[in-house]
C-alpha cells in the first residue's frame, strides 16, 4: 500500500463512524471501532487472498519446480523476494537447501497452452554471492530477468502467482524475505529477521531472535511467536493497517514497547514495560489496528 493511502483510509473510517452517529465518547469509539475495522481488514485481506488463490489453484494450470542444493558453511544469509504468491520458510537439519516453487495460472481464459509454455520455460536458481544465497525464479538462461515482466513481454500476460516452500539448514541465520502480495510463513528459524509484506499476513512461529530484526506489513495482520531473544538482539514489529498478535514464551525476558495510533492494546500497558524483569527490546506498533500480547 502506498504511504499516501493510509491517511485517506483513516479519514474514511473516521467519517464512516461519525456519519453513523458515533459521536459520544468519540475518542474511545474511534479507537475501538477502527481497531476492529482494521482487524477485519487484515482478516479480509488474508481470507480473500486465500479463497481466491485456492479457487484458481483448484482449476488453473500449474507447475511445480524443485531444487535441492548443498551450500557451504560460509553462507549465512537467505534472500527471497516475491511479487505475487505465498512464501513458507522453515528450518531443517542437514547442509542442503530445498525449494519447491509452484507457478499458478490465475487466468480462467482459454490460454492454458500459453501458460503451460511459459511455465515450461521457467527455472529456479539459488545463487551464492559472498555470504548470501538468493532464490530466484526466472526464464531459462537468464537469471536477471523478472518472470512477470518477461511473461508480459513474451506472451502478453502476467496473471500468475508463485508459491515457495523452502527448507534451510540451521547454518543460515539471516533471513531477508519480502513479498508484494501474498502470505509469509516462517517457522523454527534462529537468526536475524528482515521480513516485509505489502499486502498479506505474516506468521512467525518458534522464533529465536538474533541481532537487529524487523518484521513489517503495510496491509495485513502479523502473528509472532517468540521462543527466545538473545541479550544483544531487538525486534521491531510494525503494521500500517492490521493487527499484531504476539505470543511470548513464558520465561522470555524482554523490554516491551507498544504503540497504536488507532486501536486497542491488550495483554500489556501502552508504552514501555518490562516482562520478567526486562531484557532485549521488543517493539510492537500499528498505525491502524489492535495489539494483543500473550
Question: Residue ranges of each PLM-predicted region?
Answer:
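Short acidic/polar N-terminal linker immediately downstream of export determinants
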Residues: 3-7, 11-15, 22-98, 104-111, ...
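A generic structural signal for short beta-strands and their flanking turns/coil linkers
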Residues: 95-97, 131, 162, 211, ...
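Solvent-exposed beta-hairpin/edge-strand motifs
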Residues: 104, 119-121, 257
Amino acid at each position: 500500500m502506498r504511504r499516501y493511502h493510509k491517511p485517506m483510509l483513516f479519514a474514511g473510517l473516521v467519517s464512516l463512524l461519525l456519519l453513523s452517529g458515533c459521536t459520544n465518547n468519540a475518542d474511545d469509539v474511534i479507537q475501538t471501532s477502527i481497531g476492529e475495522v482494521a482487524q477485519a481488514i487484515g482478516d479480509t485481506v488474508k481470507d480473500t487472498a486465500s479463497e481466491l488463490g485456492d479457487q484458481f489453484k483448484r482449476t488453473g494450470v500449474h507447475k511445480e519446480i524443485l531444487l535441492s542444493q548443498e551450500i557451504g558453511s560460509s553462507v549465512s544469509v537467505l534472500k527471497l523476494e516475491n511479487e505475487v504468491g505465498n512464501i513458507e520458510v522453515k528450518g531443517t537439519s542437514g547442509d542442503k537447501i530445498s525449494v519447491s516453487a509452484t507457478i499458478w495460472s490465475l487466468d480462467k481464459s482459454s490460454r492454458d497452452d500459453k501458460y503451460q509454455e511459459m511455465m515450461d520455460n521457467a527455472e529456479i536458481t539459488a545463487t551464492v554471492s559472498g555470504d548470501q544465497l538468493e532464490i530466484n525464479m526466472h526464464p531459462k538462461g537468464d537469471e536477471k530477468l523478472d518472470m512477470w515482466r518477461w511473461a508480459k513481454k513474451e506472451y502478453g500476460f502476467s496473471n500468475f502467482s508463485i508459491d515457495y516452500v523452502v527448507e534451510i539448514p540451521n547454518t543460515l541465520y539471516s533471513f531477508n524475505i519480502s513479498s508484494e502480495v501474498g502470505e509469509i510463513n516462517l517457522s523454527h528459524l534462529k537468526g536475524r529477521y528482515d521480513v516485509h509484506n505489502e499486502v498479506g499476513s505474516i506468521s512467525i512461529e518458534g522464533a529465536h531472535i538474533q541481532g537487529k530484526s524487523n518484521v513489517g506489513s503495510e496491509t495485513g495482520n502479523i502473528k509472532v511467536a517468540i521462543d527466545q531473544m538473545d541479550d544483544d538482539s531487538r525486534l521491531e514489529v510494525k503494521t500500517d493497517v492490521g493487527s499484531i498478535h504476539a505470543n511470548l514464551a513464558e520465561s522470555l525476558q524482554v523490554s516491551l514497547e507498544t504503540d497504536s495510533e488507532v486501536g486497542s492494546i491488550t495483554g500489556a500497558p501502552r508504552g514501555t514495560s518490562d516482562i520478567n524483569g526486562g531484557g532485549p527490546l521488543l517493539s510492537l506498533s500499528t498505525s491502524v489496528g489492535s495489539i494483543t500480547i500473550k
